Amino acid sequence: MKILITGATGLIGNAVLEAALKKKFKVNYLTRDKDKIKNSIDCNGFYWDVNNDYIDLKCFEGVNVIINLVGEKIFQKWTKKSKKEILSSRIKPIDLLMKGIKRSNEIGIRSFVSASAIGIYQNDFEKNYTENETIDPQNFIQKAVYEWEKKSMSVRKLIPHTSILRIGLVLSKKNGYLKETDYPMKFGIGIQLGSGKQWQSWIHIDDIANIFLFIADTNPRGIYNAVAPNPLPQKLFLKKIRVCSFRKFMIIKLPSLILKFFFGERAYILLDSQRVSSKKILELGYEFAYKEVDEALNNLYKRNDNLT
């Protein structure tokens, strides 16, 4: 199998690329930085410039599956300009990919797999969200993810086997949630966000990478939640980190009002609760390497003693 990856230099994209090479797949990847183009027998980089509508059509040669992971970081300072960029950085690349496929006349592309986020679901402390949930976007993130998914699904006109993965909280030794919690823990403090009762639907970096490859290989259609089977409340998550990291820290409750004062509209990313089901991906046949957060954290802290 030969895969084309967008966003290959990001946290998830890099993990997908490495996992694909371990499985002996051939990989092409797109980058807007010419200095990051490297070529080998099994892995080749190609240049694209979304803003100037340019893509190297050679990137499509022999490709069976496209994995789309490109997009600007969401948790940044929100302005009218940055909000526009967060959305356009997810919409424009898909448009360019579709144009490129048409120009290339490549007929071997059988599957398109695109990232999405569980942030599309409403804040709720009781529901267990499935992919069948009616989507009624209210806030900026929900609206952005909704438009992202709509654009991804438009690829079905060219590639009928189009899938979307709604990704949860990614646990990695390199970046993301664990790195963000690391700084206060160095000073003996763990931060409970608001009530701490909000559900956190997480996934180990190895599992999210392997789910993308699993979907690429099995070639289904539709939307799948990419989360581990056992989510947990944020305050319990902190306690699990304390045990698995072998680090002593005091848990401090940071009230919602303070978070809203410092982060403004972005605070709901930290405070909202989404308990998300992995039943559909399990029924498809994916076997999680890390079903319990204890297993995931033990693995990550073992892999990098400097994580916290």
What are these regions (language model features)?
Residues 66, 208, 212, 226, ...:
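Non-catalytic, hydrophobic alpha-helical segments
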Residues 268-308:
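C-terminal amphipathic/interface module of NAD(P)-dependent oxidoreductases
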